Amino acid sequence: MTAVQKIKVLCVDDSALIRSLMTEIINSQPDMTVCATAPDPLVARELIKQHNPDVLTLDVEMPRMDGLDFLEKLMRLRPMPVVMVSSLTERGSEITLRALELGAVDFVTKPRVGIRDGMLDYAEKLADKIRAASRARVRQAPQPQAVARAADSHPAAPMINNPLVSTEKLIIIGASTGGTEAIREVLTPLPPDAPAVLIAQHMPPGFTKSFAQRLNGLCRIAVKEAEHGERVLPGHAYIAPGHAHLLLARSGANYIAQLSDEPPVNRHRPSVDVLFRSAATHAGKNAIGVILTGMGRDGAAGLLEMKRAGAHTFAQDEASCIVFGMPREAIALGGADEIVPLAEMSRRVMARLATMGDRVQRV
């Protein structure tokens, strides 16, 4: 695609109102155009052949063939960048996470028809996601039951009732586009006694709880949505809720999680920079910072602050990123001690931890 060519977008949604609104938003952007719309996947299949779109926006739930079935077939036969369009429901969030496992690049929530408040922000986010998707590295759908096999090999870790109450070592992770699958790949190999993990992943409210529950069924550590004021424990991962910044703080000898409803930073709440900066302040050399795939620059400055505070820092390499935005910016600032392929990230992090020593206080 040359610089003068617009990004061609095919919108698939069973609602004529949503198709019209998405078309209006996309066509208002100078660098993209809706080449066609479809009310269901069967019509979309023919339009893909005719128009060869650069990006597909795909409704999660539709008649005749649902979005997941269509996505799975599409990513096996003709992989292309797909942005899922999902409702803000528990079922919608679970289906969307499955779509990301199947190879969708990203997702947006459905626009609220008839409500103009917030529409400019929505339009900006939609356009950003389409631009990122058009440049994304698309991967084929995994083999059937691959994720289920991973779950079987890593049974869910129980929440600890009488836990270790303090650890000096922490793993701090930030991600955006493509991050849900990257985070899964980093977390699943971690042993049950791994240090606590704090995660900021760009996600809207309503999705992070389902994301945490899904990971908890795949990992040997316990994974949960972070709660304000809770003690940060080894063998646990804490995911920032979609409506709040996650910060690390200290209470005596212990780390605690704090949530903040302060305004977005780098247009995001939760923000990776907010989490990384709090880790630089309160954990310093006892933390490891990891920046994964994602568009934009959120987390780049924060990773550099962690490094300057003595933390060892990792950035995902370009070849394994869905979108090489946030890691690229962090590397350009000099914030990354190591640049690592995603498949090696967990092993390299644990190897680094082994050189840092292990001092854990029991009660």
Swiss-Prot record:
Entries under Gene3D superfamilies matching the protein: 3.40.50.2300, Methylesterase CheB, C-terminal domain
Positions carrying 4-aspartylphosphate: D59
CheB-type methylesterase domain ranges (all copies): 164-356
Keyword Phosphoprotein listed: yes
Active site residues of this protein: S176, H202, D298
Reaction it catalyzes: [protein]-L-glutamate 5-O-methyl ester + H2O = L-glutamyl-[protein] + methanol + H(+); L-glutaminyl-[protein] + H2O = L-glutamyl-[protein] + NH4(+)
GO cellular component: cytoplasm
UniProt keyword terms in alphabetical order: Chemotaxis, Cytoplasm, Hydrolase, Phosphoprotein
GO molecular function: phosphorelay response regulator activity; protein-glutamate methylesterase activity; protein-glutamine glutaminase activity
Ranges of residues in domain Response regulatory: 8-125
CDD domains per record: CheB_Rec, REC_CheB-like
Record-linked InterPro entries: CheB-like, CheB_C, CheY-like_superfamily, Sig_transdc_resp-reg_Me-estase, Sig_transdc_resp-reg_receiver
Record note on modification: Phosphorylated by CheA. Phosphorylation of the N-terminal regulatory domain activates the methylesterase activity.
NCBIfam families: PRK00742.1, PRK12555.1
Record remark on domains: Contains a C-terminal catalytic domain, and an N-terminal region which modulates catalytic activity.
Record's function text: Involved in chemotaxis. Part of a chemotaxis signal transduction system that modulates chemotaxis in response to various stimuli. Catalyzes the demethylation of specific methylglutamate residues introduced into the chemoreceptors (methyl-accepting chemotaxis proteins or MCP) by CheR. Also mediates the irreversible deamidation of specific glutamine residues to glutamic acid.
Entry's family note: Belongs to the CheB family.
Protein's UniProt name: Protein-glutamate methylesterase/protein-glutamine glutaminase 3
